[in-house]
Structures are given as structure tokens and as C-alpha cells.
């Protein structure tokens, strides 16, 4: 379930980059490596999502809030985009619009199901779809130990890993070495930096 974007977002000169992909594809790892690579640059921002998930639950670095806290933030216009998925609520802070208005790049961990909301909020939207082979995904998910083998197989059988819709999508296959995928991610972001400068 997704919801309306923040009404003030939209007049940005920069590029909103939304990283999507299935669990186990390596989105968080690649975003962390890219953030480290671009850490000295003032024109590339990696935003943390606000999530109604306990901070110690694992996964990405995020701002953890209660359902009540999330609702208050949504009501006050604190999100550029927010959505629900897998029983949790996710939000992208509205302040990303400040960086975008300066012609910067903002990178966020998103969701394929919420891309139409990102597109409505950000006129210059690029999507990086991180994928990996089913065998690699299964191995990574099993290594996490959060799901049974049967649950993992059911997850992988749910459907294609492609992005559906009219979006500017770059595919990034992370089936090989993390170093190779990191270089691909950096090259994609370098290309987008060239577009805004």
C-alpha cells in the first residue's frame, strides 16, 4: 500500500535515485559502499529511511519510530514519500528536497511498489534495480537465517525481479563479486553527477 507524496516536493533540479531490488540482492551493502566512496562530496547524499521497525531488528541503517510517531511525522509533512509494505511503514524525509533544489543527487533505498509515488514527487527520478540470480539470492537469504528454506523458495517464486512501469531504470546485476558490483554502482552515480553538472 502506498500513499500520496508530500505536496511540496517536485521542483528539484537534482536527481532522486531510488535503489530497489529483492531481499538478498545486496542493496544495503552497495549503498553503504557507494556512500563511503562519495563521502567527501557535498553533492551526493545518501538518505536514511524512517521505518516502523525496531532499530535492533537488523537490515539497513534507518531511523526507527513507533506507529504513532510515524503517523505524527506523516501528518506534519515530514515525508517526501511514504508507503507501507510487509507490515511496516517507510518514509523518505522531506528534507531531501533541499539537496535536490541545489542540483545534488540524493540516493534512497526504495520499493518497486512505491515507484509511482516517487515519480509523482520527484520529476528527475532514476531507478537502480539491483538483482542477482535466483541461486545467489537463495544462498544469501539462507545465510541470514531469518526464513526457512521453504519460505525463501516461496519468496523467489513470487514473480519477476524486473521493474514494471514507465521509469528510467538501470539494471545492476550483483550475482558476482561485491567489488565488481560496487564499481558498477559508482559508475552509475558518476554518470548521473555528470548530468547535473
Swiss-Prot record:
Pathway: Metabolic intermediate biosynthesis; 5-phospho-alpha-D-ribose 1-diphosphate biosynthesis; 5-phospho-alpha-D-ribose 1-diphosphate from D-ribose 5-phosphate (route II): step 3/3. Its EC number is 2.7.4.23. One of its GO terms (molecular function) is ATP binding. It is an enzyme of class 2 (transferase). Pfam families: Guanylate_kin (PF00625). ATP binds at residues 21-28. SUPFAM superfamilies: P-loop containing nucleoside triphosphate hydrolases (SSF52540). This is Ribose 1,5-bisphosphate phosphokinase PhnN. It comes from Rhizobium etli (strain CIAT 652). The gene is phnN.
Amino acid at each position: 500500500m502506498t500513499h500520496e507524496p508530500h505536496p511540496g516536493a517536485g521542483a528539484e533540479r537534482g536527481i532522486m535515485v531510488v535503489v530497489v531490488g529483492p531481499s538478498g540482492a545486496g542493496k544495503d551493502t552497495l549503498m553503504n559502499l557507494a556512500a563511503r566512496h562519495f563521502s567527501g562530496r557535498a553533492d551526493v547524499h545518501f538518505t536514511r529511511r524512517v521505518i516502523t521497525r525496531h532499530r535492533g531488528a537488523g537490515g539497513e541503517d534507518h531511523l526507527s519510530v513507533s506507529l504513532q510517531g510515524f503517523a505524527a511525522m506523516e501528518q506534519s509533512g515530514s515525508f517526501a514519500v511514504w508507503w507501507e509494505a510487509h507490515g511496516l511503514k517507510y518514509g523518505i524525509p522531506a528534507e531531501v528536497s533541499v539537496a535536490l533544489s541545489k542540483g545534488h543527487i540524493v540516493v534512497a533505498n526504495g520499493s518497486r511498489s512505491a515507484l509511482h509515488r516517487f515519480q509523482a514527487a520527484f520529476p528527475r527520478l532514476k531507478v537502480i534495480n539491483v538483482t542477482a540470480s535466483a541461486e545467489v539470492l537463495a544462498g544469501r537469504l539462507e545465510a541470514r537465517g531469518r526464513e526457512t528454506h521453504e519460505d525463501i523458495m516461496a519468496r523467489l517464486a513470487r514473480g519477476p525481479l524486473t521493474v514494471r512501469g514507465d521509469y528510467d531504470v538501470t539494471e545492476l546485476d550483483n550475482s558476482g563479486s561485491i567489488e565488481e558490483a560496487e564499481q558498477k554502482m559508482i559508475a552509475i552515480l558518476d554518470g548521473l553527477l555528470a548530468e547535473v553538472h
